[in-house]
Design a protein with these regions (language model features):
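Short polar/charged helix/loop
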Residues: 2-134
């Protein structure tokens, strides 16, 4: 049975959404990918949507929406995106904080950099799960 991984931050509109999308690409054979937050936004960050579509061919407007922690199933692994003091708590067997800067309001270059970091971290995470390290 695949592990369930949740990528979490406060608003579930940018980094956690990017991570969910990339988890569905690079971890799909190894884990189920979810994202959530303690608050939702009416729409996902449109810069994040555009960058993920340009880089990976995935339209997050079609495949995802902003969700609350209570909207997702019980998970095995919680990945915090890096929300400092106000990061949401989600019960899980394993919790990590990736400490990513929020690119909201910054240049496309920052969004691309964030996406590439998330991609590498997800590939790493998938390998650890595959090797039964998590």
């Amino acid at each position: 049975m695949k592990k369930k991984v949740a990528f979490i931050c406060v608003h579930n509109s940018c980094r956690s959404q990017m991570a969910e999308a990339l988890g569905k690409i690079y971890g799909k054979d190894i884990f189920e990918s979810y994202s959530a937050g303690t608050e939702t936004k009416p729409v996902i960050n449109q810069d994040a949507v555009r960058i993920i579509k340009d880089l990976y061919g995935v339209d997050m407007n079609e495949t995802q929406k902003s969700k609350l922690l209570s909207d997702i199933p019980k998970i095995d692994i919680a990945i915090k995106m890096g929300c400092n003091v106000v990061c949401p708590y989600l019960k899980a067997d394993h919790v990590e904080d990736w400490g990513l800067e929020d690119p909201t309001g910054k240049s496309d270059e920052e969004f691309v950099k964030t996406a590439r970091i998330i991609e590498e971290k997800i590939k790493d995470l998938a390998q650890k799960i595959k090797n039964n390290e998590l």
